[in-house]
Amino acid sequence: MKKYLLDTNVLLRFLLDDHAELSQAAAGLFQQAADGKCILILTDLGVAEAVWVLTSYYKLERQTVAESLAKMIVKAGIQCPTQESVLDALTRFKASNCDFFDCYLAAQASASGVAVASFDKDLKKFEDVSLWDAGGVERG
């Protein structure tokens, strides 16, 4: 079966349906995946880029973005190699004011039991995440 690495621009055209020709082509590709004719591979970086574009350029609400992308990741014909971490990160993103990358780090740290080395005090919001002891240095 044919597999495609999904570029964020195709994902965005499908989600936004904002360009007659490109959105239609994207919808056709997603339909092929849903019909089992191909597999679309959505990477964690593709999700991160989509989150950034949808929230910064298109000014969509965090909750809307997180829910739309979470639904996308579990669709038939879509593979996300880091699905559990990405879904956890989207849940954290929706429920906090942390940026998506920090939410992804928190998801990875929680799943692996590895502490996060960061000066970002926002990560303290995630009770299931251990942070590096910065030796009394104030986190920013």
Give the residues covered by each predicted segment.
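Short, well-structured N-terminal submotif of metal-dependent ribonuclease cores
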Residues: 1-42, 57-67, 137-140
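Acidic, PIN/NYN-like endoribonuclease modules and their adjacent C-terminal/linker elements
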Residues: 3, 107-140
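A generic structural signal for short hydrophobic patches within well-formed alpha-helices
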Residues: 11, 47, 123-124
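Residues that scaffold the ATP/ADP-binding catalytic core of kinase and kinase-like folds
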Residues: 13-15, 53, 126, 134
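Amphipathic alpha-helical segments within well-ordered protein domains
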Residues: 51-55, 70-73, 90
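Active-site phosphate/pyrophosphate-handling residues
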Residues: 9-10, 51, 103-104
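Active-site neighborhoods of divalent-metal-dependent phosphate/nucleic-acid chemistry enzymes
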Residues: 77-117
